[in-house]
Amino acid sequence: MQNPVIILGAQELGILALDAFQSNDVVVYCFLDDQVALQQKEVNDITVMGNTEDENFLKLLGKKCDVFVAAEDTAARKSLTKMLKDEYKVVPVNAIHKFSYVSEHAWLGHGNSVQAGAVINSNAKVGDSCVIGPRAVIDANAVLEDHVQLGAGAMVNAGVTIAEGAFIGTGAVVVSGVKIGKNARVGAGAVVVADVAAKQTVFGNPAKPV
């Protein structure tokens, strides 16, 4: 990556993306954020120049700058990513921390946040706009569809499939071969030994619906 990056979102996910880019000596041009209180202020020495629809900066995309979408809300990330594709014909780059590990035989889509210490092993597949927290592990042949979030230290074992929009909490373990449904939620520290239905929330060891 040679172009500077504009980060859409200057809160927690944006700060982690900044850290990932800077760990690889990638220049971050600026933040854009819709929270007025942040605008024209610095976040970790990078200025929040305007809002996420500011054409003065978005017109640079694809020519002079790349972009990463770091909105905190999944729906907002989806909306911003669609806007970038439809109006500016660009897709977000990945923010992969220098101290993560991504196998050369893994497959990643666009706009993913892969944080420090995360591991993505051989033949794993990660879709678009996923958030892989620090020290989270995606083992061989596991599949994460778009917009999946893994908390810090989550363990996704071999052959697991996690559908779009699902959330796996901090330190949770998903046992090999399990399927997690669309928009399901797995609580922190849970051990998932059976499939989880779409939109279901599970907690505990073994994980059970709540």
Residue ranges and their predicted role:
Residues 39-101:
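Phosphate-bearing ligand-interacting subdomains
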Residues 94-210:
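Structural signal for interior beta-strand "rungs" in well-ordered beta-sheet cores
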